[in-house]
Amino acid sequence: MEVFEEVRDVVVEQLSVAPDAVKIDSKIIEDLGADSLDVVELVMALEEKFGIEIPDSEAEKLISIKDVVTYIENLNKNK
């Protein structure tokens, strides 16, 4: 499964949005309707799913789904 698909599954579960609503260029807050608490919970769910740690300073930069996918792919490359 691609990283995007795994991220999409987590986003769908955490934000209760339809899978079709989650596109690579979707903005987490603007397009998917997340609030700040949703974002914190989403980051925690992503950390658990991928076995990673996302520092707050990095989490603030994750605006779109593409940002999340790129961040996770880069972490996986550096393992």
From Swiss-Prot:
Pathway(s) of this molecule: Lipid metabolism; fatty acid biosynthesis
Output the GO biological process annotations, alphabetical, semicolon-separated.
Answer: lipid A biosynthetic process
| Keyword ATP-binding included in the entry's annotation | no
Give one GO term, molecular function aspect: acyl carrier activity
Q: Which domain of life is it from?
A: Bacteria
Entries under PROSITE patterns matching the protein: CARRIER, PHOSPHOPANTETHEINE
Q: How is it modified after translation?
A: 4'-phosphopantetheine is transferred from CoA to a specific serine of apo-ACP by AcpS. This modification is essential for activity because fatty acids are bound in thioester linkage to the sulfhydryl of the prosthetic group.
SUPFAM superfamilies xrefs: ACP-like
One GO cellular component term of this record is: cytosol
Domain spans labelled Carrier: 1-76
This protein's UniProt keywords: Cytoplasm, Fatty acid biosynthesis, Fatty acid metabolism, Lipid biosynthesis, Lipid metabolism, Phosphopantetheine, Phosphoprotein
Q: What does this protein do?
A: Carrier of the growing fatty acid chain in fatty acid biosynthesis.
Q: Which HAMAP family match?
A: Acyl_carrier
Designated name of the protein:
Acyl carrier protein
Report the gene name. acpP
